[in-house]
Amino acid sequence: MALIKIEKKGNVFIVTLNDKIKGNVINPEALSAHRKVLTELEAVSENSAVIVTSSDPKSWCVGLDFEWLKGQSAEEFTGTFRELEEVFGQWAFLALPTVGCITGHCLAGGAIFASVLDFRLMRSDKGWFAFTEIDVKIPLSPILYEMADLLPNKHAVRELLLTGRRIGGADAQKLRVVDEAHLPDMLMPRALEIAEELYQKDLKTYNAMKQLLKQNLSKRIAEESNA
């Protein structure tokens, strides 16, 4: 079973996180699957857009795989953490419009992943969005902080990071953590509507705007790589 599936519907690539057993946890195997998909998407030259969804109706991405983490040395964990930063950075600056279709729980690293996408839609009736790092005692790196800070509501970012508060889709929309919240049967159709509108934009202009919106993250990545 592929951990991540990719298919094309017209001019829209649908990337499906496909680890129903573990809730699309992040571990080296998952990061490798992300890199494979990103390599395919980075080679796309025609106008397109990307939706990232999940085959699991309960979870979109619940963050680090703690079962895997228990057996890792500090050095191994640091290496995986850096790879996570690199993969999420690739998603942040992918030269195609990206839409997160959040079908369920979006926690910790999963919430960071959602934050780097251009737009976010979330299920309104079930599922939590939360930065749970404070409760699991894993502080964000400077790069991951800048990724979380891409969310437009800075007050919400501060509160969610410092409290670990879990919010549902409706509250996430009110706090502008997600752009829209919908019942499950409307979630993917609405994501497709947005993606189909976005792929028609001039990609050169779109990506120039994206670089401006995410310039603090870009600067932080450059600083860390030169340190």
Segments predicted by a language model, with ranges:
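Short helix- or helix-capping micro-motifs
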Residues: V62-L64, A156-G164
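Amphipathic alpha-helical segments at domain termini/boundaries
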Residues: M1-N18, L160-Y199, A208-R220, A227
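Conserved CoA-thioester-binding segment of acyl-CoA-metabolizing enzymes
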Residues: M1-T53, G89
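Short, active-site-adjacent cap segments at secondary-structure transitions
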Residues: P57-C61, L107-A108, N216
